[in-house]
Amino acid sequence: MKTIFFGTQPYDRESFDRINADYGIRIKYHRSHLNIDNVPLAQGADAVCIFVNDSADAPTVGELARMGVRLIALRCAGFNNVDLKAAAEHGITVVRVPAYSPYAVAEHAVALMLSLNRKVHRAYWRTRDGNFALHGLLGFDMHGKTAGIVGTGKIARALIRILRGFGMEVLGYDPCPDEAFARESGMTYVPLTELYRRSDIISLHCPLTDRTLHMIDAEAIGQMKDGTRAADPHERPDRRTQGEKDRSGGAGCL
């Protein structure tokens, strides 16, 4: 079996070469990303392996099928960069990473919150230049504040437990609430509008769909308290409207 890798980084080559020693798959690596312009690089392959920045839209999938590709393997959990309908029509199987460590993503979300609140990213550059002034770097104690979590799946549940350890009140919103988990964790489900209104920190942990894309828009930000922090590991805020709120001293997003 011959597999073409697109968007390859050095760590991809190192990891897959090590694992492939037990399987003997013929692998060819390309640093360039898959798209309609460089799809000929997949000529002669049985499968292609792609990542989040590759594009397997309908025209690209059609060309892959014409060249005999029968499998698209994603090195990620998300699959919004693949036209699944086109793949099905051409008889191409699509597989993906079923899940990441929920603790790793939850801990990263906390790192984003702390960086946004305490301006760690700005302080880093200042101290490199020997500037230890605190002006513009002050945040607030997370202990005693309110966190709003949108979506309460595996990652969010790990995050909620961490934030409860910080001594925070945690509000949650989910179309399918799990009241048993809420009681066990000390989290309270509330309507989304109330979550926006009451939260000091908001973290989004919901699938990227047409409904959730840019869900932190002007209307949502307008409901938040001034100074609310919003952390999104999944890129949901509308940066245009968030920028306007930043300039008026309101919510900040990372």
Provide a role label for each language-model segment.
Residues 2-93, 217:
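An N-terminal-biased, well-structured beta-alpha scaffold segment characteristic
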Residues 4, 71-73, 93-95, 133, ...:
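Structural detector of well-ordered beta-strand residues that form the stable sheet scaffold
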Residues 28-34, 52-53, 126-135, 183-189, ...:
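Short gly/ser/thr-rich secondary-structure transition/capping motifs
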Residues 66-71, 90-92, 168, 226-229, ...:
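A short helix->loop->beta-strand "cap" motif at the edges of active sites that frequently abuts
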Residues 90-92, 98-146, 158-161, 165:
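Phosphate-binding beta-alpha-beta segment of Rossmann-like dinucleotide-binding domains, i.e.
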Residues 135-226:
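Rossmann-like dinucleotide/phosphate-binding beta-alpha-beta segment
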Residues 213, 218, 222, 226-254:
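Rossmann-like dinucleotide-binding domain for NAD(H)/NADP(H)
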